[in-house]
Amino acid sequence: MSRAGFDKYITVFSPEGSLYQVEYAFKAVTYAGLLTVAIRCKDAVLVFTQHSVPDKLMRPETITSLYNVNDNTGVCITGRAPDGKALVQKARNEASEYKYRYGMPMLVSVLAKPWQDMAQVRTQQAGMRLMGTIMTFVGMEQNDEDGAWIPQIYCVDPAGGAAVHACAVGKKQIEACAFLEKKQKNAPFHTLSQKEAAMIALAALQSALGESLRASGVEVGRCTADDHHFLRVSDREVKKWLTPLAKPGYRAAYVLVRHTFHVVNP
């Protein structure tokens, strides 16, 4: 059925029950050509994203998708960079005002949930353009009952969002999600060590993209139970995680997964 007349306004449903403007916003995320994978483990939360320099004249160290919102919360933007940077600045302002008012850092759940609600409300307002980006918030939160630090991941997309154990967003996200779902069935992510979780996330990236990764081509951010601050992982440590994945046994495993699911590129 033709989309004529049903994709002019964000508030109009198509006969199939779709909001085409929301679908277009998700496509804008994939057109950026980057894939992001975030994963929780036993004592940490990690986010991995491709690092690509769009112009050879740009300085590579100035191009990033990872940002600190406050000391304890990080965010990865996937999609249209200008939209993402504007949202990051708003999130930083909210976190700063919260700390000034209450004297304590804003928790990742307190920050992300209102943003998810706001994204959903924007789908009901014809006068506002949806953001062509997905924000992946990561951080550690302390359990009120036993004081244990629990890793958290919240995705904020053009339709709303959710709290997740792991996620993949952007280019070829369907393949990466299929890989993560298979691994989750074999070994729940909350039982894994940091190294095991990191290797699964990197293998998901390689499986979806169909190519080997280099440490310089991946940005990694992390929060741990020992250090609650959101920090970047060095290329040296990323290289240690990538080395076992270059072995024939690992390559055969993720190629097998890729062909088993028969997924279609978004």
UniProtKB/Swiss-Prot annotation:
Compartments, record wording: Cytoplasm; Nucleus
SMART domains tied to this protein: Proteasome_A_N
InterPro entries the record matches: Ntn_hydrolases_N (IPR029055), Proteasome_alpha (IPR050115), Proteasome_alpha-type (IPR023332), Proteasome_asu_N (IPR000426), Proteasome_sua/b (IPR001353), Proteasome_subunit_alpha6 (IPR034642)
One of the record's GO cellular component terms: cytoplasm
Keywords for this protein: Cytoplasm, Nucleus, Proteasome
Keyword Cell membrane: no
Pfam families tied to this protein: Proteasome, Proteasome_A_N
GO terms for biological process, alphabetical: ubiquitin-dependent protein catabolic process
The protein's assembly and partners: The 26S proteasome consists of a 20S proteasome core and two 19S regulatory subunits. The 20S proteasome core is composed of 28 subunits that are arranged in four stacked rings, resulting in a barrel-shaped structure. The two end rings are each formed by seven alpha subunits, and the two central rings are each formed by seven beta subunits. The catalytic chamber with the active sites is on the inside of the barrel.
UniProt function note: The proteasome is a multicatalytic proteinase complex which is characterized by its ability to cleave peptides with Arg, Phe, Tyr, Leu, and Glu adjacent to the leaving group at neutral or slightly basic pH. The proteasome has an ATP-dependent proteolytic activity.
Family: Belongs to the peptidase T1A family.
Protein name, UniProt field: Proteasome subunit alpha type-1
Provenance organism: Trypanosoma brucei brucei
